[in-house]
Amino acid sequence: MSRLYRIIPMRILRRTPGVKFDEMVPSDIPKIDGIDRVIHGANSISPGPIDDCTPPVQRPWYMHPGQDDNLMVLAGTRYIDIYEPKSKQKASFIVTPEKVYKNDKLYFDGPAMVVWPAGVFHRIISGEEGSISVNFSTRTKKFDLSNNFNIYDLCTETGDYKLLKDGSEDQPDLTYEYPNENIKSLFKS
């Protein structure tokens, strides 16, 4: 059976007035290939609705074929749905910096990392205050940035899914734009 998720608790290291200091036990630290800072505004939905398909899909899903997500919420609230298509397992989490709820019940009373493997569909809503998280990505041999953020329509009853949007369409062009050709030629020579 495929693994749907894992919770990695943080260990309380120290508490002083106004300061909470927690650590992850070294044996629990995942392999880290990338560190992603993700900031959501109030009531953000990720991925957002896809209206240019028939019918429009209000709550689509991401699925990373080559990346495990190791998500830690630092501020605000994240409402996370995950779904594994082979086993048809689904779980919903409400994650804050201090607690993790699973399917609306307190699951862990403390700071923790929520982990799901490559191939698991997921979608997120941030609370009224927005949210900030850090994702410590573990990338497999199948990792490819061009499809890592593809957006899907998913039927959680059958496990059937279809591509709605190529994730590469949202990737920015990171090429520097020189103010003029003179500067560019001087710089490149």
Residues of each region from the PLM?
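Active-site region of the double-stranded beta-helix
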Residues: 1-108, 128-132, 136-189
